[in-house]
A protein has these predicted regions:
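Contiguous C-terminal substrate-recognition/catalytic subdomains in enzyme active sites
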Residues: 346-386
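Conserved redox-cofactor binding core of oxidoreductases
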Residues: 40, 92-183, 200-204, 379-386
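Glycine-rich loop(s) and the adjacent beta-strand/alpha-helix scaffold that form part
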Residues: 178-181, 185-252
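N-terminal Rossmann-like FAD-binding beta1-loop-alpha1 element of flavoenzymes
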Residues: 8-33
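An anion/pyrophosphate-binding glycine-rich loop and adjacent beta-alpha core
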Residues: 229-231, 235-361
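Conserved Rossmann-like nucleotide-cofactor binding loop
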Residues: 16, 39, 276
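Glycine-rich active-site loop/strand segments that organize a redox cofactor
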Residues: 52-89
Length: 386
């Protein structure tokens, strides 16, 4: 068995663990970081950047957002079922965090909104001097390089299995490397940054009541089994209710070019399995609100319905709602993308020549769907005439 020692051991090599390891080292501690994956960064490698409030980017862009405003919005949204002190501290420290990352060489393209009605708090990491995907990987690399400069020791492909307790106090961790060799790390403090349990259907079922693949679909980032939560609980940590943020998305993520998901996320008619409209489609730009609405529908399913006239309009003037994740230059090949998706037997995309045919494909009563569409069109005509 290999034995190591440090002032602080960090469990998890995502942005939380990387940031914690750098900060601890800057404060003068010797640090060992143990990471289950073979590379650092975690799911954030697919991300584009963190939140910031009161930053110079926002000031330059004349963004009117303050810690107090953001805090009220967040607490209103969560109905105060979160740790208010933690949320406030997170927002208060976000400006310094952005500057801290900049000191490591991270460049930000600016502060942006995720969707039109949101606030411009999303600080997107510059990729080749502009906006691109996976800027989070650049940020994570910068933190790791800074950590190495400060003497942080990184151990990838190393799974922590247990927190060592002595006389009621944390004394380190037990882990195994890729070869199966046990590693004992003695430390004065253990920082857990292992993320959630999205890749653990059992935890999701037991703690939240959802059956994965049936009434709930998630990203299920490989390796997010809830190990850190389990180890903390075994060590005697206090617990709270486990929550999950619901968003809406097509169950099959292999949707081809961006034009398909981006087009189906537009505020067009959405119906449930009964053929009934159940949401103000303007809210579709907020994936969480829409996810909440879909979650209480029969079979937790919603269908977004488009016709050729809508597609023609999008081709002429562009999409109504865009974001930096799904932002195709145009949707000129939309029909071909749909045909290709259907030919590939994608179970979540349908195409029909009539409302009745579509209803039968979706398992909806044709008369009910016809009535809903007629009512929807009447309301659109009434608005256009005003």
């Amino acid at each position: 068995m290999k034995k190591l020692e440090a002032d602080v051991v960090v469990v998890g090599g995502g942005p939380s663990g990387l940031a914690a390891s750098v900060q601890a080292a800057e404060d003068g501690a010797s640090v060992i970081l143990l990471n289950k994956a073979d590379i650092v960064g975690g799911a954030a490698n697919m991300g584009m950047g963190p939140l910031g409030i009161g930053t110079r980017q926002q000031q330059a862009q004349m963004v009117d957002i303050s810690v107090e405003k953001a805090f009220k919005m967040f607490m209103d949204y969560t109905h105060w079922r979160v740790d208010a002190n933690l949320v406030k501290k997170y927002f208060e420290n976000s400006k310094d965090t952005i500057e801290w990352l900049e000191d490591m060489g991270v460049e930000f393209a600016g502060a942006y909104k995720y969707f039109p009605k949101s606030e411009a708090t999303w600080h997107i990491v510059a990729v080749n001097g502009g906006i691109g995907r996976n800027g989070g990987a650049i940020m994570n690399k910068a933190m790791m390089e800074k950590g190495k400069e400060l003497g942080v020791e990184y151990y990838n492909s190393t799974t922590v299995e247990k927190i060592i307790m002595k006389d009621g106090k944390v004394a380190g961790v037990m882990a195994k490397d890729a070869t199966g060799e046990e590693i004992e790390v003695s430390a004065k403090a253990v920082i857990i940054g292992t993320g959630g349990a999205g890749d653990n259907p059992q935890v999701i079922k037991e703690r939240m009541g959802y059956t994965w693949g049936k009434d709930m679909f998630n990203f299920a980032i490989p390796g997010l089994k809830g190990d850190g939560i389990r180890m903390a609980m075994e060590a005697g940590a206090a617990t709270t209710d486990m929550n999950i943020e619901m968003i809406y998305i097509l169950p099959n993520s292999d949707m081809g070019p961006d034009c398909i998901p981006a087009t189906f996320m537009q505020p067009n008619l959405m119906v449930n399995k009964e053929g009934r409209r159940f949401i103000n489609e303007e809210e579709m730009q907020n994936t969480t609100f829409t996810g909440n609405a879909i979650a209480i529908q029969p079979e937790r399913i919603g269908f977004s319905i488009l016709d050729s006239s809508i597609i023609k309009g999008y081709k002429k003037r562009g999409l109504d709602v865009t974001n930096f994740v799904h932002h195709p230059d145009n949707i000129d090949d939309f029909e071909q993308c749909v045909d290709d998706s259907i030919a590939a037997k994608n179970p979540d995309v349908y195409k029909a020549d009539s409302i009745e045919e579509l209803a039968n494909m979706l398992g909806i009563d044709p008369e009910a769907l016809e009535d809903t569409i007629d009512e929807y069109n009447d309301m659109c005509d009434s608005y256009d005439e005003q």
